[in-house]
Each structure stands twice: as C-alpha cells, then as structure tokens.
From Swiss-Prot:
Record InterPro entries: ICMT_MeTrfase (IPR007269), PPMT_MeTrfase (IPR025770)
Names of required cofactors: Zn(2+)
Functional description taken from the UniProt entry: Catalyzes the post-translational methylation of isoprenylated C-terminal cysteine residues, resulting in the modulation of the function of prenylated proteins. Involved in negative regulation of abscisic acid signaling. Carboxyl methylation is a reversible and potentially regulated step in the post-translational modification of prenylated proteins.
EC number(s) on file: 2.1.1.100
Result when mutating E187Q: Activity increased to the level of that of ICMTB
Gene: ICMTA
GO terms of biological process kind: C-terminal protein methylation; flower development; negative regulation of abscisic acid-activated signaling pathway; shoot system development
Keywords: Endoplasmic reticulum, Membrane, Methyltransferase, S-adenosyl-L-methionine, Transferase, Transmembrane, Transmembrane helix
Protein name: Protein-S-isoprenylcysteine O-methyltransferase A
Amino acid sequence: MTEIFSDTSIRQLSQMLLSLIFFHISEYILAITIHGASNVTLSSLLITKHYALAMLLSLLEYLTEIILFPGLKQHWWVSNFGLIMIIVGEIIRKAAIITAGRSFTHLIKINYEEHHGLVTHGVYRLMRHPSYCGFLIWSVGTQVMLCNPVSAVAFAVVVWRFFAQRIPYEEYFLNQFFGVQYLEYAESVASGVPFVN
C-alpha cells in the first residue's frame, strides 16, 4: 500500500492532475477569449460523463497496478515519453485553436456564419484537423505518462474511433460551406488522424 505514496506515484499523479487542469482551463479561457464570455458555456471545459468515466477508470487501473505490480510504474523513460506526448499534443491543439480563431468551435457548425473562413495556413497547412491530432496525442500521452498499458490502448482506440466518425460528418458541412475550395484542400492535406482520410 505504501507504493501509492511513493515518489513515482506522487510525480505521475501530480503531472496527470496538472495536465488535466491545464488542458480544460486553457480550452475554456481560449473559447472565452476568441468568442466572448456571453457565447461560451461550461461545455467548453470539455468534460462529459463518458470522459470523466474514462479518466476514473484510468485512475483505477493506475492504483490497481501500482499496488499489484509496482515495478510497472517505474519505467521513467516511458513516463517521460508520455509527458512529452502531452506537451506536443497541447502545442498542436492550441496552435490549431489560435490559428483558426473564430472559425474554431468545440461543436460542429452545421450552418454557415459570416465569420467562418477556410483556414489553410499555419498548422492547417500540415493537417486538416490539427486539434483532433493534438487531442489524440494528448489523451494517449496521459496514459503513457501513468504507465497504464490497458488505458493507453483503450484511449487510443476510443479517441481514434470518435474522430474517425466525427471527421466525415464535419467535412460534409465544410464541403457545403466552401465547395471546391475545401475539396482541393482535403485532397492535398492529410486529416491529421492516422488512417482517417
């Protein structure tokens, strides 16, 4: 039981808590900064029941493994690689949000609005959905940092599947809004999510 209070677990759990706080607060602050406080709700914190359950299950895996297999959590290079993934994912996602500005929203827009524009510069030159790419890297990184093998695989599969379904839906409307301009962009730039065209 003392493994729960070891230096390793304190470091890993502290980094996880700080990563979660930074991610969610920064998403909310960016939404308010870009769209104005009157246009932003608490949903911009991006905390849903399913997300909270996934994080709770990952914590349960962590605690179970640190008690039963404490050596599993001692792989510092794996944990540090996960921390690097978190930082890289954050940078990509935040660069996407800042670059897109008012064209970025947490919800898929199904109606064209005057301020919408097709963003193809900055990080969008490299991929069509950098915010999804960043979140995928970030979410899997949280589990790699905790040395959670089951949750790392589960997060990768679930988040990838979510975006594999979301991207075609979102791109249907982007095609409606921007027509040939979007089709040409989509043909020349990868989605940013592996195996999703």
